[in-house]
A protein has these predicted regions:
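Conserved ABC ATPase "signature" region
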Residues: 53-70, 299-314
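Conserved ABC ATPase signature
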Residues: 74-78, 82, 318-322, 326
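Hydrophobic anchor residue at the start of the ABC signature
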Residues: 88-89, 332
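Catalytic Walker B motif of ABC-type/P-loop ATPase nucleotide-binding domains
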Residues: 99-102, 343-346
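ABC-family nucleotide-binding domains
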Residues: 109, 353
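H-loop/switch region of ABC-family ATPase nucleotide-binding domains
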Residues: 134-135, 378-379
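Conserved beta-strand-loop-alpha-helix hinge in the C-terminal portion
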Residues: 154-177, 398-421
C-alpha cells in the first residue's frame, strides 16, 4: 500500500502518523489519557510540536467540534458518542492529509451525526482524503464521491456517487447495505395493544464531585413491549439503564405488578447489554459465553440462539477475536439466554450491517412475544422502525416525551432524526 508516493510498510510509524490519522470503531481502544483535554492534545505532543502551536490547535479543534462542555472531563464518565467525538478531535488536531475512519457514526446521536457530516465536508473542502468504513450510509449522501463495496476481503464493486444513488433500496438491501434515504423508512405499521406500565420513583444520580446527570422524580414507562430510548449523547440514557438494572446502588425504586423493586432486587430481574461489550465477555469460547448466562446449561438451546444471530459458525472462537458487531451479537445472545424478565440493550446494532441488524430486530421481537420487556437505547432509526412499539425520549437527564410508534409518533421520529439530513 502506498500513501502520497511512500510505501507504508517501509515507513517508520511516526512518519505515517504525520500523514494518516485514524479513528477506531471502539474509541476507547485508542485512548491514552484519563481526561479529555489531554487526550485531544496527546498526538501533537507525541509528534513534538511546540506548546503554543498545540494550544492554538486545541482552541480551533474545540470550536470545530463544539466540545466546550466536554473539556477537562473524565473520559470514563463520557457516553460512547462523546468518546467518539473526543477520538475524532484527537485525530483532527494533528491535521493529517489522509483520515481513515472506522464506523465513526456508530455511537453518535442524530445531531452529532450532522456535526460529523459537517466535519467531513470541512476536511473535504481542505483537499484532504477521507476514507470512511461505514454501515450507516444516509449521512454520506451528497458528500461521498465514491462508494467501494467490499465483501470477503475483496473489492466487489466501485460506484460513483451517482451510480450508488441510482440503486433501489431493494438492490442495496440485497447487498446487505443500510438505507441511503431516510424518508423511505417511515411506513405506518400495526402496533400491539398497549400493555402494563412500570412506575419509576426517585431515579436521581450523580458521579462523585460532578453535577447530577439523572433526575427523574416520578414517571411511568411501558412494560411488556420493545421500548426505544432516544436522546442526544450525554442525555442520561446509559446512566438510566445502569440505575434501572441496579448497577448503581441507592438509585430509585421501580413499582411493577404491585411490587416494589429496589436496586438489589433489580440485579436479579434485569440484564443489560452494555455499549462497550468488551466489559462483559469473560469466557474462552462464544458458546461458553452463552452457557454462562443460563441458570442450567442447555447447549442445544444455546446453539439455537447463536444460529438465530448468525453466530453458530463462531461458537468455538474466542469472543475477543471477533469483530465489534459480532461481539455485540454474542452479548445479545447471552442476554436472551439469561431468561431475565427485563432486558436493556445499549446500542445493540452499532457496527452492524443491514442483514445482521434485521436478525437482531427479529430476535428482539421473538423475545418480546415470550413476555419479556425490552428497553433499547439506540440512535438507529432502522432498528426503531423495525421492532420498537414505544419511544421514551431523554434530554438533560429527564424524560421529556413518551409516545407510541403510531402516525403521530412517526412524525416525531421524523423531526428528531431527519431534520438537517439531505432529502430527495
Amino acid at each position: 500500500m502506498w500513501v502520497n508516493g511512500a510505501k507504508v510498510s517501509e515507513q517508520p510509524l511516526y512518519n505515517t502518523a504525520k500523514t494518516v490519522g485514524s479513528v477506531f470503531q471502539n474509541p476507547r481502544s485508542q485512548f491514552f489519557n484519563v481526561d479529555t483535554t489531554s487526550e485531544i492534545t496527546f498526538g501533537c505532543e507525541n509528534l513534538g510540536q511546540p506548546e503554543q502551536s498545540i494550544r492554538e490547535r486545541l482552541e480551533k479543534t474545540v470550536r470545530d467540534f463544539r466540545l466546550e462542555k466536554l473539556m477537562g472531563r473524565n473520559i470514563f464518565h463520557l457516553s460512547g458518542g462523546e468518546k467518539q467525538k473526543i477520538a475524532c478531535a484527537g485525530v483532527s488536531i494533528m491535521e493529517p492529509d489522509v483520515l481513515v475512519m472506522d464506523e465513526p457514526s456508530s455511537n453518535l446521536d442524530a445531531s452529532s451525526i450532522l456535526d460529523l457530516r459537517a466535519t467531513l465536508a470541512f476536511w473535504k473542502s481542505q483537499g484532504k482524503t477521507v476514507i470512511v468504513s461505514e454501515h450507516r450510509l444516509y449521512y454520506l449522501r451528497g458528500l461521498a464521491d465514491r462508494f467501494i463495496y467490499i465483501t470477503g476481503g475483496k473489492v466487489e464493486k466501485d460506484y460513483s456517487a451517482a451510480e450508488f444513488e441510482s440503486l433501489t433500496e431493494q438492490q442495496r438491501a440485497k447487498l446487505g447495505l443500510r438505507t441511503f434515504i431516510l424518508e423511505d423508512l417511515l411506513p405506518p405499521k400495526a402496533l400491539p395493544q398497549a400493555g402494563q406500565q412500570m412506575e419509576l420513583r426517585n431515579f436521581c444520580f450523580a458521579y462523585k464531585n460532578e453535577p447530577e446527570t439523572l433526575h427523574i422524580r416520578e414517571s411511568k414507562i411501558p412494560a411488556n413491549r420493545i421500548v426505544g430510548i432516544i436522546g442526544n449523547n450525554g442525555a442520561g440514557k446509559s446512566t438510566f439503564s445502569r440505575c434501572f438494572c441496579g448497577l448503581e446502588k441507592r438509585c430509585g425504586e421501580v413499582i411493577w405488578n404491585g411490587r416494589t423493586y429496589r436496586p438489589k432486587d433489580r440485579l436479579n430481574t434485569c440484564y443489560m447489554v452494555m455499549q462497550e461489550v468488551n466489559h462483559q465477555l469473560f469466557t474462552e469460547t462464544v458458546l461458553d459465553e452463552v452457557l454462562i448466562s443460563m441458570e442450567e446449561e442447555n447447549q442445544e438451546w444455546a446453539e439455537e440462539i447463536l444460529a438465530e444471530l448468525d453466530l453458530i459458525g463462531f461458537k468455538d472462537r474466542h469472543p475477543m477475536s471477533l469483530s465489534g458487531g459480532q461481539k455485540q451479537r454474542v452479548a445479545i445472545a447471552s442476554a436472551i439466554a439469561s431468561k431475565r424478565s427485563i432486558l436493556f440493550f445499549d446500542e445493540p446494532t452499532s457496527g452492524l450491517d443491514y442483514k445482521h441488524m434485521k436478525e437482531v430486530a427479529n430476535v428482539l421481537k421473538q423475545v418480546r412475544d415470550a413476555g419479556i420487556t425490552l428497553y433499547v437505547i439506540t440512535h438507529d432509526l432502522e432498528l426503531l422502525l423495525d421492532c420498537c412499539t414505544d419511544i421514551v425520549h431523554f434530554e438533560d437527564g429527564s424524560i421529556i416525551d413518551k409516545f407510541q410508534m403510531d402516525e403521530a409518533g412517526l412524525e416525531k421520529i421524523r423531526n428528531y432524526f431527519i431534520k438537517g439530513v439531505p432529502t430527495k
